[in-house]
Amino acid sequence: MLLKDLPEDARPREKLLARGPAALSDAELLALLLRTGLPGKNALQMGQELVDTFGGVAGLLHTGPEALKSIKGLGPAKRAELVAVLELARRALAEELKEKALFSTPQAVRDYLQLQLGGRPHEIFAVLFLDSQHRLIALEELFRGTLTQTSVYPREVVVRALALNAASVVLAHNHPSGAATPSRADEALTQTLKSALALVDVRVLDHFVVTSTQAVSMAELGLL
């Protein structure tokens, strides 16, 4: 069934204009972005397929353009538009968290890191530099590739911490494979950086392993 064949109060565009965006389901909002479907599958059905396939809007926020190719009828133009909208949403949420949140609990950091690293296709080591009140000074991506004690240089982390006048840091890296369990190499790297930063009175509060679906706190696991 085409969207135009639905009752007027059931069509996403008319429903939004009459009742506001909050009245629409996630699938209906996505249908407005998609605009058209393909034979046998209208835009609303495609929107529902996106929600079901990627686990709702939260899952879509961590979905890259390659994964979207699995949705039949989602061509390059629609994928590009959808990725652009999702990126704007990620940036807006990240700005709000950065401006308003104190990074004093694992959950606050987890939410922020999920937005920043959850959907990245390559392994990245990042550091959140915090002031004495656990407010975010900066998030910096310092290294890329397979992380080992030899590929992450403690001196560079220390130099950045001093340059930013950070009182503490939270370490983070992503596992694109989807396995969130910290490895022995992750534990060894954490201790190396913890010792190096202690020499300049900068505390390591936590080290998170981030995947597209979760962020695991090494502090909560007793590995810090």
UniProtKB/Swiss-Prot annotation:
Q: Name one GO biological process term.
A: proteolysis
Asked if Protease is a keyword of the record, the answer is: yes
Specify the MPN domain's residue ranges.
102-224
Domain of life the protein comes from: Bacteria
A Pfam family of the record is: UPF0758_N
Extract one GO molecular function annotation from the record: metallopeptidase activity
Residues forming the motif JAMM motif are 173-186
Residues binding Zn(2+):
H173, H175, D186
Q: Does the keyword Zinc apply?
A: yes
UniProt keywords, alphabetically: Hydrolase, Metal-binding, Metalloprotease, Protease, Zinc
Provide the family line: Belongs to the UPF0758 family.
Stated name of the protein = UPF0758 protein Bpro_0948
Q: What is the lineage of its organism?
A: Bacteria, Pseudomonadati, Pseudomonadota, Betaproteobacteria, Burkholderiales
